[in-house]
UniProtKB/Swiss-Prot annotation:
Induction: By salt stress and light. Its main location: nucleus. Residues 238-309 form the RST domain. It comes from the Eukaryota. Probable inactive ADP-ribosyltransferase that may be involved in stress and developmental responses. The keyword Nucleus applies. The lineage of its organism: Eukaryota, Viridiplantae, Streptophyta, Embryophyta, Tracheophyta. It is found in: Nucleus matrix. It comes from Arabidopsis thaliana (Mouse-ear cress). Disulfide bonds: none annotated. Residues 28-255 form the PARP catalytic domain. One of its GO terms (biological process) is response to salt stress. This is Probable inactive poly [ADP-ribose] polymerase SRO5.
Amino acid sequence: MDYVRTQVEAVFDDSEQDGSTISESGSCDSSSDRSFADELGLMELLEGDKAHDLIYRNCKSGLGDQCQILSVLRNGFRNVGSRAKLKTFQVFQEAVQMKHGGDGGAKVKYGWCSVSKHELKTIFEYGFSEPLRNDGSFGRGLYLSPDNSPLDCLKDSASESEDGMRFLLLCRVLLGKSEIVPQGSTRSCPSSPEFDSGVDDLVSTKKYIVWSTHMNTHVLPEFLVCIKAPFNLTRSPKRLRSPWMAFPVLIKALSKFLPPSQILVIQKHYKDQQNRRITRSELIQRVRSITGDKLLVHIIKACGHKVQH
């Protein structure tokens, strides 16, 4: 959903300053960016899409203000090759489930993998290949960070462009039964058929290790997040987060104070923003001009606590 923080200053000021939406960033407004996504078989997700908003908030929480999230794209599995990869993943998921007796052994998680722009086409067309973008300290394979730790993945990468563009793949990872892999390992496959993947720690996992023998059957790239980040990333302290509320909920609350004619205008502006005819900044300014900040502050403070996450 299209979330609005319950502090009106944060809603209106932060979104204009930090480029917090796809449209404002300019990342996917040009024909070249659209052709880039089309070439990879990806579909841009807009604000209001559930997957977009979950990924955006997860990234924003994990990366902080030092990174600018430019766009979120989903693998559409449009061509024969990508659909075959999806089917392959599903077949191996069933096989792992059968191997472990159907007792939940086919564990699937989401994990982050940092890639360069020139690697993207190869990965989406042919799959992962070596050499991989890791230090090899846990053996030969693909290392992914848990979905709540995008910064760990991003810190392992280096921006190859002057503008600081980074690319993160959010992948479905078929972990199955994991074993601990000690640092310094030189293995490229599980220690025995009992195991399907590796981790650095079973309790506090920072790395998923998918062996080179498994990385094109047990990893399925599903989302691509384009990020602009400084060369030297730091683990910034987590900031206090204000509660959020859905924009449609805000419109519903405004309908108790504004005449129907003004609500219709706000709904039209919101629809225009969803269809990318206007940017989020323009939507915000137009809503403010209709309601005034005083009414917005009152409604958001009164209603925001009901939709905290």
